[in-house]
């Protein structure tokens, strides 16, 4: 997993970064639009993650993307329309699944 990382935030167009950080991901359509823009901005980061770590849920993929954008748990909950406890549960599952969790970010 060491070769996964994508671009750093400071190399991404500020307008695109703003758009990603202020997205709302409530529907599958919202997620697809967000994922497309995110992958374009971060060198197919999410696609690479999905290929290298099969079996990740959509919620886990969303968490990874939002965490990479340095979004807080509270804001992740608002963006995805779930409670903060749901976000914490996703993080907990990821920590169990991925021994190299911190290297993703």
Q: PLM features: residue spans?
A:
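N-terminal regulatory/sensing modules of transcriptional regulators
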Residues: 1-26
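Cytosolic nucleotide-binding catalytic cores of signal-transduction proteins
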Residues: 19-20, 24-105
């Amino acid at each position: 997993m060491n070769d996964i990382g994508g671009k750093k935030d400071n190399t991404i167009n500020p307008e695109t970064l703003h758009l990603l950080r202020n997205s709302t991901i409530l529907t599958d359509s919202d997620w697809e639009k967000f994922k497309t823009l995110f992958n374009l901005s971060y060198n197919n980061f999410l696609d690479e993650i999905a290929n290298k770590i099969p079996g990740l849920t959509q919620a886990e993929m969303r968490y990874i993307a939002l965490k990479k954008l340095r979004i807080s748990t509270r804001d992740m909950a608002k963006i995805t329309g779930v409670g903060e406890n749901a976000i914490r549960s996703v993080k907990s599952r990821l920590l169990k699944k991925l021994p190299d969790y911190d290297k993703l970010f």
